[in-house]
Amino acid sequence: MKSQWECVLENLGEWVGSFTTVTSQGEPIEDIPSVIKLAGISDNQAVHLVLNRFYPLPNSTEKYVKEVVWDFSTPPGVSVIYFETGAFSSGAPVVYIGVKTIAEFSLIAGDRRFRMIQTFDLAQQLDRVTFVREQLQGATTPERPQVDIADFVGTWTGIATTSYADQRPSIETNTRSTFSVSDTGYQLVEQDHSIDLTVIPDLPSPRLWQFTDDRDCQSYQILLLPDGGYAITPAKISLEHPFYLEIGWIYQTGQRQRLVRRYDSSGKWESVRFIVESIEQIGRAHV
């Protein structure tokens, strides 16, 4: 098993992409091109990071650059856990009313990365989602289209690795979930637990779904995004019940990765789960 630092090093390289921010309803706010370079130094005992983001100038076709430079020799991030592919999640160790909650996620597949920052306001209502689509400099892998209902339909099986905030040993478990669509609605069956989903009406495209998970009595939404990505969050975090924050990425047809960050009913961070799945059986979507 790799150390946390060895997992960090899976992210070395020059990644070209953009930071795209949308509202909680998926409406666009901004799209900022970016280049981030992570280079190993001192025989990979440390990493030199340079992030450049290219912002438009008012009334001009020119752009100005905001640069961040950072050297680090321990895994960066707050309450962060890395996994063997280089995937990671970081965020607040405790969620409070009156303090913004920010959670970051990153998934990696070959020469591509899909990252996300979920931001909740002072009342713990989802404020915005920033997703970052990147590929290594020189890579030619095409970006995937926005997730569609048909991409989920079928039975997914895989392996989940769960790492804990209290540093107890990680565990691996098998996963199995089935997503089905009919003329009457959408249903997810996961480990023998059934969830019904509803599309939010009056949006330009069916990119936002809602469901209630009776295991933790929270109402969640699923926001569908470009490049095969999606976010699952409470529309508003209720600190009376446990909750989770999730990112998913269908990085190629029938293949996906997920990160699930869990909190208990007091708002304390408990664990991060990294799931790698493939589709076993494809169903039929009625759209």
Segments predicted by a language model, with ranges:
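Soluble ligand-binding/transfer domains with enclosed cavities or grooves
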Residues: 4-8, 19-284
